[in-house]
Amino acid sequence: MPPPPGPAAALGTALLLLLLASESSHTVLLRAREAAQFLRPRQRRAYQVFEEAKQGHLERECVEEVCSKEEAREVFENDPETEYFYPRYQECMRKYGRPEEKNPDFAKCVQNLPDQCTPNPCDKKGTHICQDLMGNFFCVCTDGWGGRLCDKDVNECVQKNGGCSQVCHNKPGSFQCACHSGFSLASDGQTCQDIDECTDSDTCGDARCKNLPGSYSCLCDEGYTYSSKEKTCQDVDECQQDRCEQTCVNSPGSYTCHCDGRGGLKLSPDMDTCEDILPCVPFSMAKSVKSLYLGRMFSGTPVIRLRFKRLQPTRLLAEFDFRTFDPEGVLFFAGGRSDSTWIVLGLRAGRLELQLRYNGVGRITSSGPTINHGMWQTISVEELERNLVIKVNKDAVMKIAVAGELFQLERGLYHLNLTVGGIPFKESELVQPINPRLDGCMRSWNWLNGEDSAIQETVKANTKMQCFSVTERGSFFPGNGFATYRLNYTRTSLDVGTETTWEVKVVARIRPATDTGVLLALVGDDDVVPISVALVDYHSTKKLKKQLVVLAVEDVALALMEIKVCDSQEHTVTVSLREGEATLEVDGTKGQSEVSTAQLQERLDTLKTHLQGSVHTYVGGLPEVSVISAPVTAFYRGCMTLEVNGKILDLDTASYKHSDITSHSCPPVEHATP
């Protein structure tokens, strides 16, 4: 039967139980690596009974008396522990004296030498537990530490970023996951979740907030840029970026380019550059060199002046072919001074009229068929001994008795003045006033048996004196001029006292040659354009190429309507403006409004103010106004007749008309030959 354990063994057992109790009260969970370290196979000492025996041998052999290395070998029974123990044993004797001196510190020093974990050689911060081995020890490291003494920090971020979804920060013995700006760390401590900054209404202020992964963006409509300082969308001035080839106008969130319409330019498809306005419908513009156009001089002055001198008394004989759609005007004058003897052959209401004055006595006679039908007919005037005979197509339509001769004797010669397309004196000096302007054509003329050959040469040299070879009814605008009128659009109703009402109603029948041009416009004395009706080939706000008719007050489009402007057909454009109403129709189809009810009322109030002042009516174009004063400033090219407030506009009655505009005739569309 073995002997009972000694005091040292009992003390060791108690310490072991205390350690186990302590460990059990604080559960320690080791990672797999630590557990493997702790359970790692090693050369263990003998069972506890032998450990206790060894401690007793050590007490007897080396504490109570001095032991040699061989005696120590007998205690430990192995070289590693002996090699570890004996040098330190000698150190204990040097420090605390030999055994026989009975120094308690010496006994304690020797008794602790076999436990290589006392004092603990492992790093205190990084060690979970120190294992005593034969002449050695093993440090079991806590998470985040490594190395023999557990004093080396393990960089967990090296492998798979430490499990962090974004940022891994290594720390002594540990690590921490972090997130980029705009993300927050989830409850698992590893995953980063996007922060939706747009949930805060103040994030972008007036702008739209768009959440992005880890960020956000403040968005503005096109034409605006975001100011982070003021948190507002601010207008971009595109005109500072030289986007337009010619004139640029900035507007909130947008801009518009304008081209010199009067110079024959319009916007290109890119809506920034300019291009020429070119015809899309060909008109038959051929002229006849054998014809004489009577309507070239809008002033009413004659286009031809002849003076005949004869030695012998001579009678007038005139014959010519004539064609017109014009109901009124002067064909020719023959005679002397206004207060002497003369005749004027003209048209009134489409029929021939002869005004004559002999010896201060004036008469008027009119007879014959209506001849302003646009077809050629031969007209002749023959002075007989006591009569004037006028024939149409060889048929006498007038025979007038006269007392005197048209050729007047002066200084020994017989004189006769002859003017074509006008009179040589004021209209007021006629027997009855007549509008002398005549859009008519003459050919095969014969004045006094062909003694006027110089006229033919003059006409050949000047195309403006020549007529279109073929014409139709209407007015032709060549694209380089306009006509003006002084019209009144307001009236005071007697039924309602002094209240002034106003109305602008326009009916335009057009056959355009180009897709851009002003049909009609009102212009104030300050060059403001209160109203304009025009053809345009783009939608200004949508910046889209499209053939349209636009109705505008100043530079604001009230209504738009599509039109097939290049189809060679006649179209009817109807415009009506009055209190609370603005309509545009093309061929009976109503156009689309471009303004709100409030904006319309504001524009109509502005128009009313202009109409109560001085306005001029322009047809076919605009004067030299700013290119931004109206949506279109280009001249109209094509055929057109106009009716304003129920009255047909006769271009012969205009205040001014460009000489290239033909008042009552228009060349036909030139159809391609198969």
Swiss-Prot record:
User: Which cysteine pairs make disulfide bonds?
Assistant: C62-C67, C117-C130, C122-C139, C141-C150, C157-C168, C164-C177, C179-C192, C198-C209, C204-C218, C220-C233, C239-C248, C244-C257, C259-C274, C280-C566, C441-C467, C639-C666
PTM annotation (Phosphothreonine): residues: T609, T617, T633
Coiled coil start-end: none
Against InterPro entries, the record matches this protein to: cEGF, Coagulation_fac-like_Gla_dom, ConA-like_dom_sf, EGF-like_Ca-bd_dom, EGF-like_dom, EGF-type_Asp/Asn_hydroxyl_site, EGF_Ca-bd_CS, GAS-SHBG-PROS
Q: State a GO cellular component annotated for this protein.
A: cytoplasm
Q: What is its main location?
A: secreted
EGF-like domain segment(s): 113-151, 153-193, 194-234, 235-275
Which residues are tagged as glycosylated in the record?
Answer: N417, N488
- Assembly and oligomerization: Heterodimer and heterotetramer with AXL.
Please report the name of this protein according to its UniProt entry: Growth arrest-specific protein 6
- Print the miscellaneous field: GAS6 deficient mice show protection against thrombosis, but no spontaneous bleeding.
**Known role:** Ligand for tyrosine-protein kinase receptors AXL, TYRO3 and MER whose signaling is implicated in cell growth and survival, cell adhesion and cell migration. GAS6/AXL signaling plays a role in various processes such as endothelial cell survival during acidification by preventing apoptosis, optimal cytokine signaling during human natural killer cell development, hepatic regeneration, gonadotropin-releasing hormone neuron survival and migration, platelet activation, or regulation of thrombotic responses.
| List of residues that carry Phosphotyrosine | Y636
In terms of domain of life, where is this protein from? Eukaryota
Q: Which Pfam families match?
A: cEGF, Gla, Laminin_G_1, Laminin_G_2
Task: Show which residues constitute the signal peptide.
Answer: 1-27
- Gene3D superfamilies per the UniProt record, alphabetical: 2.60.120.200, Coagulation Factor IX (4.10.740.10), Laminin (2.10.25.10)
Biological processes per GO annotation: activation of protein kinase B activity; animal organ regeneration; apoptotic cell clearance; apoptotic process; B cell chemotaxis; blood coagulation; calcium ion transmembrane transport; cell-substrate adhesion
The UniProt PTM text for this protein says:
Gamma-carboxyglutamate residues are formed by vitamin K dependent carboxylation. These residues are essential for the binding of calcium.
Provenance organism: Mus musculus
- Annotated ranges, domain Gla: 50-91
Gene this protein is translated from: Gas6
Q: Which UniProt keywords apply?
A: Calcium, Disulfide bond, EGF-like domain, Gamma-carboxyglutamic acid, Glycoprotein, Growth regulation, Metal-binding, Phosphoprotein, Repeat, Secreted, Signal
